[in-house]
Each structure stands twice: as structure tokens, then as C-alpha cells.
């Protein structure tokens, strides 16, 4: 049988950048990183940008170069933007619809966050049913939306986004990696067993880059020093 008998896919790919110096075009960096991670997911993609605390983004079905035309990418490029997240999706759970594309942006009573997720939750259906019984309304069918609801609920109850993510991870079962962007912070996390890959790079001007694979660090148009695999 040919090596190319099956479609190319590698689950999903996540990316995040925090540019402390504010000298990089973080939207362009996210685009280049997603292009490098395209082999991990070909169904949909998205980028969210933090422009001085205001989070906006674009996501849709299609390949990176199809979804992010020069006009779309230009609308995300802001001189004061210092953080961005990005995602390429191959559906391991949920349908192939735009509502399942990432990053998912949530606006709640304590602010706004954008969340990217790679992996699978073995208790996603159980968590979804619990949330629906509490009044949650889901627009898609992915595990990621379940995680978004849990982080949001915990953020409304807890003192920080870090604690909210930690409390959420206490009830998640499965293999996953996360990149979460709030108005002031960029946070990356993995399941306790570290099954899903996540690389970390540092920026020479100060800041960090997170990605599912080191190829995204090499091709994100940023000089990466000391990339390490976590």
C-alpha cells in the first residue's frame, strides 16, 4: 500500500507568543508558525491577537494560506499588539464546522480570553452534560469548548487566570496541551503526564514562544534562543 493512501494529519497544532519588547509583528509570527504546523491539521485554523489588552481574532475552515489572506492578516497586525495565539485543527473530536475552529475567544465578566487546545479528553462528554445541566449553551461539538466553559467559570470564582486553569485541569482527564491568552498574560500548560508535545522558545528582547513542534519556532520569523522541549 502507498505511504500516501491516507490523508495527512497530526492531530492539531498550537502556538503562542508573548513579545515583552513589543518589537515583533506577532500576527505575522503566528501566521508563519501555523504555516510550519500545517501538517498537524488541515481542516481549520485561526489566530487571536492581543492589542493592548483587547483580544480579537479570525478563524475559519481551510488551510492557513486560504484563511489568512493579506487583507485578513493585515487587519490583525497592530503596532501595539504584543501577544498572539494560533491553531491548526484536525478533528479528533467534534464535527468539521466553523464553530469548532480555534482559538476560541470568550468574553466574560472578568475580561476576555483566547484558548487553543491540542488533544483529547476522555471525560469530555461527562463534563459537557454536567455543564449543560447547569445552563451552559454550546455552539460547537469539540472538547475545546468544554475547556473554555470550565476555565471561564473558574475565572469568575477565582482570583487569577492561573488558578482558574489549574482548577480546570484538576477535572480534565486525557492527553492535551493548552495555550491561553488573557488581557495581560499568556499561559501554556500540558496534561500531568505530558503526552501532548509543547516546545518553549525565548525571545532575545524578552518574552516567550510556545508551539506544538520546534519547526514553528524555527519558521516564525523570530530569532529564537535556547528552544527546549517540555
Task: Give names to the regions the model predicted.
Residues 226-230:
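Short "domain-exit" segments at the C-terminal end of structured domains
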Amino acid at each position: 500500500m502507498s505511504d500516501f493512501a491516507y490523508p495527512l494529519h497530526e492531530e492539531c497544532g498550537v502556538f503562542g507568543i508573548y513579545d515583552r519588547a513589543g518589537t515583533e509583528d506577532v500576527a505575522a509570527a503566528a501566521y508563519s508558525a501555523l504555516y510550519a504546523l500545517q501538517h498537524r491539521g488541515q481542516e481549520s485554523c485561526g489566530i487571536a491577537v492581543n492589542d493592548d489588552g483587547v483580544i480579537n481574532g479570525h478563524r475559519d475552515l481551510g488551510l492557513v494560506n486560504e484563511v489568512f489572506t493579506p487583507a485578513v492578516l493585515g487587519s490583525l497586525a497592530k503596532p501595539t499588539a504584543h501577544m498572539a495565539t494560533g491553531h491548526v485543527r484536525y478533528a479528533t473530536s467534534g464535527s468539521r464546522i466553523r464553530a469548532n475552529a480555534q482559538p476560541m475567544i470568550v468574553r466574560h465578566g472578568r475580561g476576555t480570553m483566547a484558548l487553543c487546545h491540542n488533544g483529547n479528553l476522555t471525560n469530555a462528554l461527562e463534563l459537557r452534560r454536567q455543564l449543560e445541566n447547569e445552563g451552559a449553551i454550546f455552539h460547537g461539538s469539540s472538547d475545546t469548548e468544554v475547556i473554555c466553559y470550565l476555565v471561564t467559570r473558574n475565572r469568575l470564582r477565582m482570583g487569577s487566570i492561573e488558578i482558574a486553569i489549574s482548577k480546570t485541569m484538576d477535572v480534565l482527564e486525557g492527553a492535551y496541551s493548552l495555550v491561553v491568552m488573557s488581557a495581560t498574560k499568556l499561559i501554556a500548560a500540558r496534561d500531568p503526564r505530558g503526552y501532548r508535545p509543547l516546545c518553549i522558545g525565548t525571545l532575545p528582547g524578552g518574552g516567550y514562544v510556545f508551539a506544538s513542534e520546534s519547526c514553528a519556532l524555527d519558521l516564525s520569523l523570530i530569532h529564537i534562543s535556547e528552544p527546549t522541549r517540555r
